[in-house]
């Protein structure tokens, strides 16, 4: 071992000048025959830790800091620690700490500021004492400032004690100096790799390189861009991306080492200790440029000097104060730039093998510095050992991790010593968010060093693998401890304001625990986790949203299904909850978490929107009652307790409802508004009777009088004379000259006939796209706006009166009605040829887009046989489409088709539609759901069609003709079956409630076999003659379908 610097007592074996200065490296002869593991330097004393765990001290002993009564002119063993195996030592100005292999911490020396942690402020303690308050902890790492101490426990808990004059304990403003270890809660949850103390400032380093500083900052030694002291840990943001792996502190300056071997310094620079070729202070971390060409693996700070070791050359560089020889350069001058320490240094033994003088060279193993002294552990050529690399973190020194190795150790311990101490040790780690947060880091290309509000830096796959292993029966004892730890400690103690993003990984880890999926643990694990997530403050909550945006769809799907399952579990067992408020709290937490996930999914589309549906809800909850409660709540009214017991309304979370449930809600809303309109009419009628004006009485229905031969004109006239409130009434249609009572069939016939008439191509209101069989608003139309308004009202009335109509509009229409902007996919649906062409333009890989496609910002449209060119942007005919603007061209093209060219007609249509159907309930629908509600869907179940059919006349399900009919029908191909639906019901799609809601009717007729089947479209009624054979039935039915062109009305 070599040493240099200031030796006030002039220890034997070291040659000093009269002032006790050693200006260049000398061999410490007094301890050369012992194997030194570690050296700690205080203000004027040193502590030597040997490989065998013995501790020696020398130097000034005025406060008992040597731990023995002997003079300090040579290293003497501390007898009081002889029975302990010490693995780590640290020194303050006049006090010392020693850490045993059992995680126990001993202190001695000056104690007037509480720096010994012994719950007293004795001026001095000459014999090492155990710090009792930490006895229940396994301490892994300690560091001393001048008058304060830091300690890191295995479970990630961080303790400080001693002087707090500048906030160096990190406990906040209200705390004075502390005579016993205090937990620093502001860093909880962060997996810490290192703690380091300077004169009166402190640092903590996370496993992923986040640096936190606090305490004295008079010279900028915290790196926080100012010179203000900090009473609580503050994130040094300028170092976040530097992959910091080690920190060393001087009295008023700080040095950090990065994974790439770079060195940053900041703080006091009055002696050149920052190495920036100046004597200036630095308030921001600044890289030491002189060392940039070298890969540094070790750094150490003394009071006012800094050391850096470069293994490739074997050289130690020193800079800063040299007045007491502490730089080892052979002189006592201050040095502003890194300078090599004097001596014979070699990188490794191979470098020396050919040299005759190889035996005088030193190969550095580790450097130590403190106060005005420096020590170097080194080896000679013949017993070379590789240098310690501070960039490689020693797992024994930082927050314990949960992995295969620790699980194996715990399993063995629990099987051998299943006692309280063993269990408590395991539970301490398992209950620590910090331990879990550091256990599954994404180490591929150092990804975890990039941890940020957008990147969690965690390998969820390894999390999943570990939990799956733990589900094995051989780990049952560990699993039991994990379960208990999660239930009683970890989840209940999760903070609403995590100190850093690294403390938030636990929210991604916990959902991977398989027992969360088990309904037995919904109340004790799954729901409490949801509550913890929902308690998060705004910023951490946004971070979790960002991370959920980054996870794989499989993980996201599992999370959604987890809380859907919890909602179902709670609804099914709601009667078992003796305290209703508990049920409300639990289900609200599950629903709000699903809502949070749903909002994330709206942005990133991990899963389809219907993944959030809980179809079973319709059977577990009265949708009408729930909607009524929601409606009253929205209106600021309260329902009578006798009507509604629970305060949670599922309608507040519409994303969990499938299309059928939403349709039920819309129909409930329609019935509610119809009732309001009817009641209003009835009230007015009573008033009119009382005032003898019965002729002015209002009908409780929306009654339309129309003629078949002037259907459009009459409909326009009738609807124009009714108020918006009238449109909310139940619809009844009367065809002039016909006495039929409208029980629903006449209304359906009215819709079918009116829409067929309005959509007739002769009016030119809509353009028919042959390759998609769809209609869209014509961009050149000469009919009045009120025609489009009428179509809108008609479509709204159809929905309002639960009637499916046969409309061939693309999904884009329903998107626009719900304020969703149509895109290229919608153009592909409407006009596949145009859509494919635009996609090819976007996908074209070459640079020659202009020459290949020859396009400008215009669109060609046919108007009454004439091709017209429309500009997509001002001056579009002079703007050529190129590689850089092609996306802009496609966006403008799509916008023209769906927005600009049809704005007038669509506005008239939507105002009519929304006049009837507008409102909050409509906003709950997805575009595809709104389309399915208006025109039905294609979820065919032909067996169900047969099972729900009704028979009249001579027919029954067992009648021979009926059997022949169904045999024939089920043999039809899909397109022919759809044609039958169109023939019988007026639409080839089925209502949103499914095939059962069609309930077709088949009745016998007296007609002979030569007659065709006849469909009464308005009533879903089929007149079926009694055919004698399957062949005749098939032929006649096929002929009827082939001859069908419009509505076959009775």
Swiss-Prot record:
Q: In which pathway does it act?
A: Protein modification; protein ubiquitination
Superkingdom classification of source:
Eukaryota
Q: Which reaction does it catalyse?
A: S-ubiquitinyl-[E2 ubiquitin-conjugating enzyme]-L-cysteine + [acceptor protein]-L-lysine = [E2 ubiquitin-conjugating enzyme]-L-cysteine + N(6)-ubiquitinyl-[acceptor protein]-L-lysine
- Which regions does the record annotate with the repeat RCC1? 1-51, 52-101, 102-154, 156-207, 208-259, 261-311, 313-366
Enumerate the active-site residues: 1018
Q: Which UniProt keywords apply?
A: Cytoplasm, Cytoplasmic vesicle, Repeat, Transferase, Ubl conjugation, Ubl conjugation pathway
Annotated Gene Ontology cellular components are:
cytoplasm; cytoplasmic vesicle
- GO MF entry, a single one: ubiquitin protein ligase activity
GO process annotations (BP): protein ubiquitination; ubiquitin-dependent protein catabolic process
InterPro entries documented for this protein: HECT_dom (IPR000569), Hect_E3_ubiquitin_ligase (IPR035983), RCC1/BLIP-II (IPR009091), Reg_chr_condens (IPR000408), Ub-ligase/GTPase-reg (IPR051709)
The EC number(s) given in the record are 2.3.2.26
Gene3D superfamilies recorded: Hect, E3 ligase catalytic domain, Hect, E3 ligase catalytic domains, Regulator of chromosome condensation 1/beta-lactamase-inhibitor protein II
So which residues are the signal peptide here? Answer: none
**Boundaries of every HECT domain copy:** 951-1050
Q: How is it modified after translation?
A: Ubiquitinated; which promotes degradation by the proteasome.
Q: Which PANTHER family match?
A: SECRETION-REGULATING GUANINE NUCLEOTIDE EXCHANGE FACTOR, UBIQUITIN-PROTEIN LIGASE E3A-RELATED
What is this protein's name? Probable E3 ubiquitin-protein ligase HERC3
Organism of origin? Homo sapiens
